[in-house]
């Protein structure tokens, strides 16, 4: 199963040029708990934000760059490589370019809905026409920011993108 996991604001924003504009320890704990099984796939910019791989998971970086990755990270040249991992859950963790590419293959979305607009410059793709919400948590607040956890399931079959 391919899952995208992200925190998005009311405009589907995920980050500004300076990074993620909210600090939500509860969301970080949720992310760590949900992604402990399976493997992680991240884009180059997200990889550069990590000083070390996420513990206990295979950490793949989607890149066409042939430069060696830091210890604990594995290269993936195309999302089609996910087909070679059919027995594992796959967690796509960003960034914006990778989310846009991977959403056509996604079975589920695990979204933290940040209930305010942070005027982001990087965005999660539109998902409302292809997915239906099947779980929603209660509203929470940390550091003056309200948010809630939602899970969405695809209502049509995932597509194989011929461009990846």
Residue ranges of each PLM-predicted region?
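Enzymes that bind and transform nitrogen-containing heteroaromatic metabolites
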Residues: 1-164
């Amino acid at each position: 199963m391919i899952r995208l996991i992200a925190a998005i604001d009311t405009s589907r924003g995920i980050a500004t040029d300076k990074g993620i504009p909210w600090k939500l320890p509860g969301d970080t704990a949720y992310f760590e708990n949900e992604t402990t099984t399976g493997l992680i796939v991240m884009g180059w910019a997200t990889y550069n934000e990590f000083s070390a791989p996420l513990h206990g998971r295979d950490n793949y970086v989607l890149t066409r760059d042939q430069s060696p990755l830091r210890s604990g990270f594995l290269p993936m040249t195309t999302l089609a490589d996910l087909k070679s991992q059919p027995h594992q859950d796959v967690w796509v963790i960003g960034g914006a370019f990778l989310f846009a590419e991977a959403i056509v293959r996604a079975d589920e979305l695990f979204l933290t809905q940040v209930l305010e607009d942070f005027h982001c410059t990087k965005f999660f793709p539109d998902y409302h026409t292809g997915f239906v919400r099947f779980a929603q948590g209660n509203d929470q607040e940390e550091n003056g920011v309200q948010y809630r956890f939602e899970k969405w399931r695809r209502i049509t079959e995932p597509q194989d993108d011929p461009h990846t």
